[in-house]
């Protein structure tokens, strides 16, 4: 198994500074972790490891879902992890982290819902979606990398965290999505440039590491454009993902972004986005976004029943927003349009939508011929570490039975979000609390079929999250 090997490698890195033999006499105190004496010579490797940084994270996540005509589904997850990063030596440093998750209590997450015959969607995502029966052995080696950093250049090789428009953390569960590969960054005061090659993914709600093609299809696969179940899981071929990007500062508080994602043998996505940033002297802001997608070869498999991106389709997305900061408040209106030429496709295993109209709890990936209208408001307290985020959106989707434009058979819906965050101070410094509630209301025909509304619409969802960082 690869997993034990990776943990062995991580252990080697953490213990590399030990000089003691591992054999212990039976009458000796255990010395497996070596001596604790601080090394004074800053030129050697031992000093660099001893002067490294350690970050700890404890997390509690309660989740419950209220579906129409159904019992409440719930889960309480708890977990913790450690991250270590050595002090640089010749501009090189090493990082490693791991995390465990435990199912403290939950409703039945193993058997399909009795009305829709589908597995739980939200609560199961706190654990391992590939093994719903696993409640205790949920652990993952998350980061294991070597990093070169000098002046404005950073190059990271190995398992790492990445946050870009197309591949991102999507950290709305216990643990985020992680990637493996090489990632380089150049940053100066106004501009940032990125480039990398990725060949492994460990998606949110999983514990293993998967090759690029294997990682696509771990989540729900939806349907083909003719309405038959998509068959691309374990049927795709791809060597990896090439990702490049740039963020360039323009005059008068404007920023433009360019991103291109090349998924070998499957599809290519390009994004251009320009944003005017708010300032005290100019509190108004706006943004424009365009995304284009084209199929590569046969979309991953020449068999149309097993392809990820059907060769007959392409997609174009246009987005816009306009907002104003007013004292402690920030208000915006947002719009997204996906054209009729095809579905906007992006493996959900790799991250959330980059659209201005994204609201926590749902995505529009897999849709074509979509119009989304969203209002967002944010309140930041002056004298308290308190943020309140609110959102309301109308998502005009194609009919559920228009399979060519509606991959997951989702009804048009209204969504209402409330997200409250508080960072404790004083004695409780390090603790953070978050309360989330959203409700989705179907506004078009669900054909009285539970599989079209269970965990999709006519439902509410509640989260209470506690984090302790140390």
Where are these regions (language model features)?
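N-terminal periplasmic/intermembrane-space "pro-region" immediately following the signal or transit peptide
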Residues: 2, 6-72, 83-86
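Transmembrane beta-strands of outer-membrane beta-barrel proteins
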Residues: 52-58, 94-96, 155, 193-195, ...
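Residues on the lipid-exposed face of transmembrane beta-strands in outer-membrane beta-barrel proteins
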Residues: 80-86, 144-148, 182-186, 244-248, ...
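Outer membrane beta-barrel
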Residues: 85-116, 131-211, 248-254, 333-337
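Outer-membrane beta-barrel translocator/channel fold
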Residues: 103-110, 194-241, 283-355, 362, ...
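Outer-membrane beta-barrel "beta-signal"
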Residues: 456-470
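Solvent-exposed loop/turn segments connecting transmembrane beta-strands
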Residues: 69-73, 138, 169-176, 200-204, ...
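Transmembrane beta-strands of outer-membrane beta-barrel pores
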Residues: 60-64, 98-104, 150-152, 159-164, ...
